[in-house]
């Protein structure tokens, strides 16, 4: 579920793929699952924001390139990145006010698993830094929609600026 998201149909398909991959093998390990399972777009974006947070910009750029090869549009990717940072911001504020993960999920109407992932990430950010990133997202969105520059390049420059 961590790799595929919470869509039951996708989870079911991925389990079927694992069973076919295993054949007669009685056990499976984490490495097998990571190699076989396709990460959801949402999981890729969480991974992307994790790379950014850790300063692993090369990995972040490579993931952007991979997603674009898979026909994901830079504007869509930025929208998802922005959504993640807004979620981080909301989680940071509400957790400071003493809300639990479940309360946060209910308050902002987000799946509890997304909130759990976000709460693990927000520990590494100050509120002002999150606001700065959200502002940079808005500026990049404007550039993507109004500039004649290559959209992938604009997105990569955004990642490098964080």
What do the predicted segments below correspond to?
Residues 1-162:
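Conserved beta/loop motifs at nucleotide-recognition and modification sites
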């Amino acid at each position: 579920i961590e790799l595929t998201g919470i869509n039951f149909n996708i989870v079911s398909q991925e389990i079927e793929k694992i069973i076919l991959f295993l054949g007669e093998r009685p056990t499976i390990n984490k490495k097998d699952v990571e190699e076989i399972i396709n990460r959801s777009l949402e999981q890729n974006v969480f991974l992307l924001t994790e790379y950014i947070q850790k300063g692993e910009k090369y990995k972040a750029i490579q993931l952007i390139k991979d997603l674009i090869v898979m026909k994901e549009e830079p504007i869509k990717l930025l929208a998802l990145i922005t959504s993640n940072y807004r979620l981080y911001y909301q989680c940071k504020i509400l957790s400071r006010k003493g809300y639990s993960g479940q309360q946060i999920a209910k308050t902002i109407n987000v799946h509890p698993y997304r909130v759990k992932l976000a709460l693990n990430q927000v520990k590494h950010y100050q509120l002002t830094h999150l606001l700065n990133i959200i502002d940079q997202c808005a500026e990049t969105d404007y550039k993507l929609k109004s500039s004649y520059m290559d959209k992938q390049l604009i997105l990569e420059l955004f990642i490098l600026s964080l």
